[in-house]
Regions:
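Bacterial N-terminal signal peptides
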Residues: 8-16
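C-terminal helix of von Willebrand factor
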Residues: 220-221, 228-276
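VWA/integrin I-like adhesion module and closely mimicked acidic/polar interface patches used
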Residues: 181-231, 248-251
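DG-centered beta-turn motif at the end of beta-strands
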Residues: 56, 87, 100, 119-122, ...
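Acidic, polar low-complexity linker/tail segments
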Residues: 23, 28-83, 88-97
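Single conserved hydrophobic/aromatic residue that forms the stacking wall/gate
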Residues: 280-291
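Von Willebrand factor
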Residues: 75-131, 137-180, 211-221, 246-247
């Protein structure tokens, strides 16, 4: 692996808006950034590069802040919060739905003691059926009660609810959501696409997709799903009934290979603003600041 020579992150105080400004650096993708001032945590995905904390400099409110640590994610050490969003609509087909539950159950068996799981289901209704658990038995017990028998798919509302819950949670070293769905929203008037896009624009949580290739969803709906994932700085994966476990393993490898970067601003003053923006090499990432 080659070492990163220059990695500059710029944090700018904003009123909840992202700004497209480039900074210097190499091929690094920022997936998550959060703050509980004076502490800041950043998740960084690299293209086969090493990151050392000496390589990382942050500019916070006009002041230079050096990283105190930059480590590869370690489930035995770093805290992780994961939201699983599971589509209960009949359009998912039983085989795809069963594969999704098996993926989540396998994750629970191997997640480590520092991971907290939330499970949100959506069909004609949206429900948080698991409100933060580290108990694999509890997670699998809840999964066993679920079936894909609902008409309608409140896809947008489920994503918004996950981000709303995230906003109330303490900062974690890593946080992301995984949506198991074919990606179509049949329910209008509850939460709109624009509302979700606006929420993503003010959120720091990446959304990853496990899209079921059922063949029932239009190219337009798949495009909407893909754009929401990209806007959140997540990534879309597509699975069939034959390869769901392998595809989900790839997603887990992607998230587990990230660097966890910590920095300390030296004070907890942020002028009463609840949102910060992270500007870096190629794309903006929101930094959620907890007062």
């Amino acid at each position: 692996m080659k070492r990163v020579n220059c990695f500059i992150l710029t944090l700018i105080l904003l009123f909840g808006f992202a700004v497209s400004v480039a900074a210097e650096g190499e091929s690094i993708r920022i997936t998550y950034a959060g703050a509980n001032l004076p502490e800041i945590v950043v998740n960084a995905q690299t293209d086969n590069m090493d990151i050392d904390c000496q390589d990382v400099t942050l500019n916070f409110d006009g002041k230079t802040v050096n990283a105190s640590s930059a480590e590869k994610y370690d489930k035995s050490k770093h805290s992780r919060r994961v939201f699983f969003l599971l589509d209960l609509s009949t359009s998912m087909k039983v085989q795809y739905f069963t594969s999704a539950k098996e993926c989540i159950a396998d994750f629970a068996d191997n997640m480590g003691e520092n991971t907290t799981v939330y499970l949100i289901t959506f069909g004609k209704d949206v429900s948080c059926v698991l409100d933060g658990s580290n108990d694999a038995g509890e997670i699998k017990s809840v999964l066993s009660t679920l079936s894909n028998n609902q008409g309608g798919t409140k896809f947008f509302a489920a994503i918004k609810q996950a981000m709303d819950i995230s906003d109330t949670c303490p900062m974690a070293d890593m946080e992301y959501a995984v949506v198991f769905s074919d990606g179509e929203d049949f329910q209008t008037g509850d939460t709109t696409q624009k509302e979700v896009e606006d929420k993503i624009g003010k959120s720091a949580m990446p959304i990853y997709a496990m899209r079921a290739e059922t063949g029932r969803v239009s190219a337009s709906d798949i495009g909407i799903f893909r754009s929401l994932v990209a806007e959140s700085h997540g990534k879309m994966y597509s699975y069939s009934t034959e390869n769901a476990v392998e595809v989900f393993d790839d997603l887990n490898s992607e998230t587990a290979s990230q660097y966890i970067i910590h920095a300390d601003t030296g004070n907890n003053v942020f002028n009463g603003l609840s949102q910060l923006s992270l500007i870096h090499i190629s794309e903006p990432t929101r930094l959620r600041c907890i007062s």
